[in-house]
Amino acid sequence: MNKFNKFYNNISEYYSNNIVTNFSPSNGYRLRCEFGYHNNSYLMHKNDKKIYLETFENAASCIQDLMPKILNQININESLKEKLFQINFRSNVNDDVMVSLIYHKKIDKNLIDIIKDISKYLKISFILRSKNYLYSTESTYFIDYIHNDAFKIYQTDNCFFQPNKFILPKMINTVISLINNPKDLLELYCGVGTFTLPLSKIFIKILATENNRNSIKCLNKAIITNNINNISNSRLSSNEVADLFMGKIFKRMGDINLSDYNFSHVLVDPPRSGLDDTTIEIIKNFKNIIYISCNPETYIDNIR
């Protein structure tokens, strides 16, 4: 039984209507890729085995094209190779690319000068990371555009962003299509605002929560850039949101008051581990729940 049929069988107990399945191409779809570096190659692990590669067919074509070029630059330069252990890529709808090189050593001026030259040569931005240190050849923010380029959105090199460039627009459009009689929205795990920004045109007000500091910074930057005035956000975990609804006061909420909201919908986009019991107890009191999941097993477990 393939994964689709397994999910259809598991969900049938709770949902009997037609299920629409969207597919992306099997290659060239990933906007975000992370690799180790070992033996002069990119390194991935699968089924406890090491896989060495020079390019990665699942990555967006702009990343695929760059991977051998960057690998060559690293391998011919001992300063770049030394104690390099991870190489991350991010790309966007314009095929811009940000590359992060992560080291187990102090980043010195020589390394910075080398990466500046490579950045100019390849016409891409680089991030150099080591413990408690970050250097960027350009901005530490990576810009992308969503919802038919209607919104400018920001990422950092280490915050979560939906990786599939073909499925993401369909996800946003599907969420929008599910909304009827919108009033105010509570959003948990809002990230950098992938859904928050387009939904701001549908709901009267949005209270968005997220535990990651960098993601909140990206969202705040996007709110200002896109001239949006109906999104409030706070750095809260899902457990803290549950505590908030049970009366706990958080200084991080500032002047945000729950009593000012008339929530008609809640949207959750949790990690693969799904929702904890406390969060489920809170959101099940909402009439309309939109649950975006990357793990069908925890999704089924949560809706039970």
What spans do the regions from the language model cover?
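Short, well-ordered strand-loop elements centered on a beta-strand within folded domains, enriched
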Residues: 40-47, 95-102, 133-135
